[in-house]
Amino acid sequence: MSKYSEIAAQGLWKNNPGLVQLLGLCPLLAVTATITNALGLGVATLLVLIGSNVLVSLVRDFVPKEIRIPVFVMIIAALVTCVQLLINAYAYNLYLSLGIFLPLIVTNCVIIGRAEAFASRNSLAHSAFDGLMMGLGFTAVLVVLGASRELLGQGTLFGGADLLLGDWASVLTIHVWHVDTPFLLAMLPPGAFIGMGLLIALKNVIDSRVNAMQPKVESVSVTRARITKVN
């Protein structure tokens, strides 16, 4: 398996930031009431991940080890500020919907963790690809959780898509079934915890079945012969 294939497998499945590392749970559980919010936060995190990995990889040889963490945090904070200003300018309603969780991307352990564990020790290309794959893996978890909560809670999919894509995107809303009263358990944080637990359980079941299908390698025991010298 090539280096890029291994990075992709780690980010999307084997070491997924949300399902395996369980990082960034605060925004993951709080913002994923709809697909729109989940996708907006996921794309913002993805952009910051790629940018921080690239910049950290570029400056890794010039930053003393003693101050590397503060420097990494400053880089991440600058990128989050840029993304925040962009969303504020071009998707103001989404900016209001995400609220405090948008600037809190600075404290997301996924980003600082990849900067320290990977980007500071690998090449520019590998670091950028790692940021892309980790960001996509995190965004996928956000979107799946947001879709399930929106579907169970409101009976819709892509509700409020115009907040992210503009007024024309209001036609993207899909009404799967009619709901007179929203299912509050799915819409509130307790429902997010339950949904997250079910997603983790599903991943573990899939992994266990895949491992069970793998051919078993039988270990051959070797008995060491004792040689006694005869005079």
Swiss-Prot record:
Enzyme Commission (EC) number: 7.-.-.-
Catalytic EC class: translocase
Coiled-coil features, chain-numbered ranges: none
Topology of this chain in the membrane: Multi-pass membrane protein
Pfam families: Rnf-Nqr (PF02508)
Record keywords, A-Z: Cell inner membrane, Cell membrane, Electron transport, Membrane, Translocase, Transmembrane, Transmembrane helix, Transport
Localization in the cell: Cell inner membrane
One Gene Ontology term, aspect cellular component: plasma membrane
GO biological process assignments: electron transport chain
Entry's transmembrane regions: 18-38, 39-59, 69-89, 93-113, 127-147, 157-177, 182-202
Protein role: Part of a membrane-bound complex that couples electron transfer with translocation of ions across the membrane.
NCBIfam families the UniProt entry points to: PRK12405.1, rnfE
Family to which this protein belongs: Belongs to the NqrDE/RnfAE family.
Subunit field text: The complex is composed of six subunits: RnfA, RnfB, RnfC, RnfD, RnfE and RnfG.
Name of the protein this chain belongs to: Ion-translocating oxidoreductase complex subunit E
